[in-house]
Amino acid sequence: MQSLALRLRGTGSPLDISAPEGMGVTLRPYQLQGVAWLQYLRQNHLAGILADDMGLGKTAQTLAHLLIEKQQGRLDLPALVVLPTSLVFNWQAEAARMAPDLRVLTLQGPRRAEDFTRMANFDVVLTTFPLLWRDVRALAAQPFHLLILDEAQSVKNAASRSARAVRRLKARHRLCLTGTPLENHLGELWAQFDFLMPGFLGDSRSFQRLWRKPIEVNGETLRAQLLAQRVRPFILRRRKEDVATELKPVTEIIKRVQLQGQQRDLYESVRVAADTQVRRLLARTHFKGAQISILDALLKLRQVCCDPYLIKGTKMPATMERAKLELLMTMLPALVKEGRRVLVFSQFTEMLTLIEPELDALQLPWMALTGKTPPAKRGALVAQFQSRTVPIFLVSLKAGGLGLNLTAADTVIHVDPWWNPAVQQQATARAHRIGQDQPVFVYKLVVQGSIEDRMLELQARKSALVEGVLGADGEGAVKFSEADLRGLLAPMAAS
């Protein structure tokens, strides 16, 4: 730690930089500052997290950095980019458009083993997190100039196969790209720095004792400020409202709907069953050890809010109310008539399947992208939506919430809330990003007085953790507690 401090004192600040020759896009001033910061890290043998808001061009800045490395003769070994499967075509397209001089190899498909011996002949090698641990032996045999994790929160669990695999790879320099370096708890930040600069934040146990418990459990604001000071030199984070001032602001509208009749009765019966199940769990084990089972118990309650037909193994009467679907089918025809282009996000792929026949009945054109969509087809779907020929794009939160450029959309509908607000913000950023020239309207459909309403309260408190460590003087984190659970399982207020 002392040697790192001495090195930082002698490095000065990043120098102004010009865009590299052959860059296919004009870099904005803040993007040039980002490239200068990446060069500064490389020059001083440091690592870091480029954590700009979603949609501010982290890929463009990284490609410019790689192009400079090539033009100045330092890219004698390839750079390896590890990314989610859904982003492969985006990186391929962006590299071809922005930095055509970079030779790019994609490791994909059953015959990718044939490409392992060719990696050294390319400037950039792309692979995915699911393939990384399968191919780790071959990848570990090839040294790299730069190892980049795109959407680096994918290795936030230090014990995961992907996180263990990246630690086996050899590279001169390391970089994380993510719009959400911190989503749920401080352990995620530790995992990323343990990859970037092992030992910088201590081992997992000491980090838990010195930082996580004081900040997350005890709410010690001073400790949060001290941690922020320690990591700040290695995190570059800019916000849309600060640097992309030409972007119109997002207008967020919460559309609350009330459950009626049989759907309301179903909610109450599922709530009572979930409450009983959770009480039994807590009688047998401690709260922390039961959280996965508790989330599973809460799942049915969330499904009833979204649509009763999501509950498997239960025959629903034909007269069952479907409050959100009815609201959605009122909204979408009106939005399409106004000429709006709409992204509809749901965490439940099955919910999108339930929406499809309703759109057909209304003769509204639509497309869908889920985890079952083959990677090779995703680029064509995005291009078709961007061409403005189809007004409605149904997208599963997990498959399409990261990395896609969907600026043809001016309206985003979140059918169901998710525990982590950053996940929905990432999805919204598919439309609200550089290249968007229209105001963006975001609708969140929420069942009034239900578990969903209480999830919004939890989301607001979770945001305090991000603010406290990544750049504001926020208070400490709030964990998912037993008190929170009692609120989530509380009866719905009488209408």
Regions found by a protein language model. Name each.
Residues 2-220, 228-495:
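ASCE P-loop NTPase motor core, strongest for the SF2 helicase catalytic module
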Residues 224:
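Short, structured active-site-proximal loop/turn typified by the sulfatase FGly-forming signature C/S-X-P-X-R
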